[in-house]
Curated annotation (Swiss-Prot):
<comment type="similarity">
    <text>Belongs to the glutamyl-tRNA reductase family.</text>
</comment>
<keyword id="KW-0627">Porphyrin biosynthesis</keyword>
<dbReference type="InterPro" id="IPR036453">
    <property type="entry name" value="GluRdtase_dimer_dom_sf"/>
</dbReference>
<dbReference type="GO" id="GO:0050661">
    <property type="term" value="F:NADP binding"/>
</dbReference>
<feature type="binding site">
    <location>
        <begin position="110"/>
        <end position="112"/>
    </location>
    <ligand>
        <name>substrate</name>
    </ligand>
</feature>
<comment type="pathway">
    <text>Porphyrin-containing compound metabolism; protoporphyrin-IX biosynthesis; 5-aminolevulinate from L-glutamyl-tRNA(Glu): step 1/2.</text>
</comment>
<feature type="binding site">
    <location>
        <position position="116"/>
    </location>
    <ligand>
        <name>substrate</name>
    </ligand>
</feature>
<dbReference type="GO" id="GO:0008883">
    <property type="term" value="F:glutamyl-tRNA reductase activity"/>
</dbReference>
<dbReference type="GO" id="GO:0019353">
    <property type="term" value="P:protoporphyrinogen IX biosynthetic process from glutamate"/>
</dbReference>
<feature type="binding site">
    <location>
        <position position="105"/>
    </location>
    <ligand>
        <name>substrate</name>
    </ligand>
</feature>
<comment type="subunit">
    <text>Homodimer.</text>
</comment>
<feature type="active site" description="Nucleophile">
    <location>
        <position position="50"/>
    </location>
</feature>
<dbReference type="InterPro" id="IPR006151">
    <property type="entry name" value="Shikm_DH/Glu-tRNA_Rdtase"/>
</dbReference>
<dbReference type="InterPro" id="IPR036291">
    <property type="entry name" value="NAD(P)-bd_dom_sf"/>
</dbReference>
<dbReference type="InterPro" id="IPR015895">
    <property type="entry name" value="4pyrrol_synth_GluRdtase_N"/>
</dbReference>
<dbReference type="InterPro" id="IPR015896">
    <property type="entry name" value="4pyrrol_synth_GluRdtase_dimer"/>
</dbReference>
<dbReference type="InterPro" id="IPR036343">
    <property type="entry name" value="GluRdtase_N_sf"/>
</dbReference>
Amino acid sequence: MSLVAIGINHKTATVDLREKVAFAPDRIHDAMKSLATHTQSGEAVIISTCNRTELYCNNGEEADVVQWLEDYHQLSHADVEPCLYQFKDQEAVKHLMRVSAGLDSLILGEPQILGQVKQSFVKAKEAGTVATTMDRLFQNTFSVAKKIRTETEIGAAAVSVAFAAVSMAKHIFSSLSTTQVLLVGAGETIELVARHLKDNGVKTMVVANRTISRAEAMCDEFGATAITLEQIPDFLPKADIVISSTASPLPILGKGMVEKALKQRRHQPMLLVDIAVPRDIEAEVADLDDAFLYTVDDLQSIIEQNMASRREAAEQAELIADDQSYQFMEWIRSLESVDSIREYRTQSMAIKDELVERAVNKLAQGGNSEQVLLELANKLTNKLIHAPTQALTAASRQGDLNSLGQLRTMLGLDKD
């Protein structure tokens, strides 16, 4: 039995190649069935995200899995092979654990990958390509990822601009659930900010954008209110937190607009986070009392400090992955003995049944019970020790002291 993992990711391949080896969600069930059949492994899980495509098989050969990937996507070996990484057994297990814990991610320690791995596992179960080994592997992996996040600081510090912006708000306000938030822009960064805010209990969000339809589409997901940029002065006085990220070449929030809003707020403090380049909020806003303005540069210094913290945590996480992958392989190796134990027990029972049947027949024919039992015991002993005796004799004749020592240990002859 051997575990195989092959894949490409953001570190080994360009976006162009990653797109070519990705698996469409509506085809991944059939793909996993095809992979399991092709490799005759019976078990296969495919993880396919924007940053990586990875194939995990049980009882497969690396070359067969690579061949299947190339054939499936109609790619040449010359295109794929230089970008591939391959792992086997404990290294394959450790790699999956590292991936799931965010140790192999573009952003070290990011939590989203664990959810993506879980989704891939669910799809594999739906496809019928998960049995005992893969089920145990992935369930163990999820536990290890949780252990790493619990016992280390790998996910504690913000390392994205969006997350850092929300983390700053959490430090300033005791509870985000009672705050009102104005988001300026409706791009990917603001969408990520909105998701973090919602996860942290924010209930009232307003999204201002030049194109109202784009803002409305985002608001549907987060239960927010969409407005145009021209409506910002009407909503700004109600905002405890303002986070802005647009592509505007000129500032959208000027000192005068913010000053007027603060007066209407009766000088209740306002946190403004400008994560746009060029700036969305005039730098002079920082001169206003009760206005606390932070820029992307302020956040970047926080992120750099946090990345250093995560790298330290990653060293601890690697040790956990090492230990847990070794323990999993011990379980795998224990499985390999099950068939041998079952076969040995069956063989011994067959010998016993044959000899007992003979003894019963002799007793039925009036044989002396003491002699019959003694003969049964002797024959049973001789048959059961025949194979070990031959092995001991062969090892001795060949001068194989290592095998001889192992046999003595297995037979319980060397007792401390």
